[in-house]
């Protein structure tokens, strides 16, 4: 296409645009104009006024009015303030859990414990030492500790008749009057009085006495017999008896050796050197003859 053709096309489009603009700029005919006030057209103002009247008629039957809804929506932030404040207080308490908050909790716990202790029934009695065992209830000692300002310790007992019994008692000597004891009873027994009371309950039991060993003589030897002794472990009495037996055996051995040696010497000595029994040598003759005797020097005496 040439440039002239393009210009003609552009001019044609511009002319049609001008014609359309001229037509649009002209006034419309009255036949095309819509009437402003007609009875057949929709009027929204009248409809809205009718809805308002119906709303006013049904307003008493509504569960919530618009005013209450508005006030509730407005009051929500105000109601949420205490909740937020409570949250702040809780978080503040958590932050101070290792400080004043914890102290406050401990104080409340100690107060509750003190109130429980005050509610427990306590009975204090002053008795003498000989009346300590006159108590009809069975007790078992479970502790003892020193008391500040008193040279005497305090003993703690619990009821031994029943495991679930909460009865307790404390016994301590009165520092002002050492002849008396202060007994403090706490709580009551939840069972009947025991018919038989173990008198050794709460006290240290003495060791059972063992029967004394009996001594029996067999072939002139003392033998110790004890029912409770272990046969594998020798007792002190048995060891002493063994020592005595050894000494007796050694004595008899020496006597036998002396008798044998005496018989051997008597075979090589003259009759003047022998005693009447013939067991031990003895000098009964002349000493000069003994020295001149050749048998004396050649006998067994000098070899012995």
Curated annotation (Swiss-Prot):
Residues within the DNA-binding region(s): 128-194
Segments of skewed composition (Basic and acidic residues): 78-88
Keyword RNA-binding included in the entry's annotation: no
Residue ranges of the region described as Disordered: 76-96, 185-236
Highest taxon, organism lineage: Eukaryota
Keyword field: Activator, DNA-binding, Nucleus, Plant defense, Transcription, Transcription regulation
Compositional bias of kind Polar residues: 196-213, 225-236
GO biological process, one term: defense response
Induction: Induced 30 minutes after flagellin treatment.
Subcellular location, record wording: Nucleus
Molecular functions per Gene Ontology: DNA-binding transcription factor activity; transcription cis-regulatory region binding
GO CC aspect terms: nucleus
SUPFAM superfamilies given in the database record: WRKY DNA-binding domain
InterPro entries: WRKY_dom, WRKY_dom_sf, WRKY_plant
Protein family (similarity comment): Belongs to the WRKY group II-e family.
Something else known: Acts downstream a MAPK cascade and therefore might be regulated by phosphorylation. WRKY 22 and WRKY 29 may provide redundant functions.
Function field: Transcription factor involved in the expression of defense genes in innate immune response of plants. Interacts specifically with the W box (5'-(T)TGAC[CT]-3'), a frequently occurring elicitor-responsive cis-acting element. Activates WRKY 22, SIRK and its own promoters.
Protein name (Swiss-Prot/TrEMBL): Probable WRKY transcription factor 29
Species this protein is from: Arabidopsis thaliana (Mouse-ear cress)
